[in-house]
């Protein structure tokens, strides 16, 4: 009887050991502001330049959707949630792009094209956000989230500028 109990216990531990990695993989954290397709694109992009540009594309998309929602004449009961959700998604994309810059710097990857793209597009994002802060419709609904988005964009621009200054110059190729 005792040996049967021991065998049963070992069998259950074996099954639990096989199932545990699958359960952990199923609970892998996903960024709730990225769709499955977008998350796959980020995962598939191996180059930090590509990943940063993808995050900037997704941020631009969220900002465009936010502007579209603002322009819509709608009396939705959850309008505030939609607007704040889009701004939070924008901020998450910009923050992730800034995080990718930091990671690429640590790995000493050449991300100059992505940094220049971040500076150019980030300034445009910031101008749009500042314009909304001055005279955006229904500002009281999303004021705090808008302030966070502007702060995140400014921080990302500072990170990009700092990274561009700290990055070693590209190697000079000499003619043979």
Label each PLM-derived region with a short phrase.
Residues 25-176:
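Long, charged/polar, soluble alpha-helical segments
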């Amino acid at each position: 009887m005792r040996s049967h109990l021991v065998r049963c216990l070992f069998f259950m531990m074996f099954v639990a050991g096989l199932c545990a990695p699958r359960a952990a993989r199923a609970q892998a954290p996903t960024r709730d502001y990225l769709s499955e397709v977008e998350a796959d694109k980020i995962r598939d992009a191996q180059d930090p330049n590509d990943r940063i540009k993808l995050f900037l594309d997704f941020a631009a998309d969220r900002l465009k959707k936010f502007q579209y929602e603002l322009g819509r004449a709608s009396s939705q009961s959850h309008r505030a949630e939609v607007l704040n959700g889009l701004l939070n998604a924008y901020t998450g994309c910009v923050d992730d792009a800034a995080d990718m810059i930091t990671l690429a710097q640590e790995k000493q990857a050449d991300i100059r094209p992505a940094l220049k793209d971040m500076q150019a597009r980030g300034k445009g994002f910031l101008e749009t956000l500042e314009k909304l802060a001055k005279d955006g419709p229904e500002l009281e609904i999303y004021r705090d989230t808008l302030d966070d988005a502007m702060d995140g964009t400014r921080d990302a621009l500072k990170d990009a500028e700092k990274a561009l200054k700290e990055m070693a110059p590209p190697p000079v190729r000499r003619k043979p």
